[in-house]
Amino acid sequence: MHSSKLIGTVCLLALVLCCVDATLPTTTNPAVVEFGTADAALLQCFDKTIYEFNKSPSAVSFISPTNINYVKVETLKPGLNGGVTAEITSGAIKKPNIVITLTEPGRRSLFKSNIRVTMFCAK
């Protein structure tokens, strides 16, 4: 009798853990978003960190004397904190100006992780 209660308790605990795991939010947003093509000949011309708990969405803009050829947006704490949605809202790659809008996935109003935006320009 005692062992059947133990087995029942273990089965119930396993069922509860499976249900809890199924309710955790899944993130399909990547930890890194890239625009353009990385090249060793490019120079880093911009670096900015959007800190955790800042408002989402947030826009990052930059005007360079030379063309911006590659942009890397990365979540600094990926995993359960998820990724980030990034899109070019003004300007373009291989142009001297660009505006990138960053959004926390899941319609949250604050970023759950630090986000780093790095831009690389032509020499």
Positions of predicted regions on the chain:
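Short, structured beta-strand segments at or near domain termini in extracellular proteins/domains
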Residues: 112-123
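Extracellular attachment/recognition segments
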Residues: 54-107
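General N-terminal targeting signals
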Residues: 18, 90, 117-119
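Cleavable N-terminal signal peptides of Sec/SRP-targeted secreted and luminal proteins
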Residues: 3-22
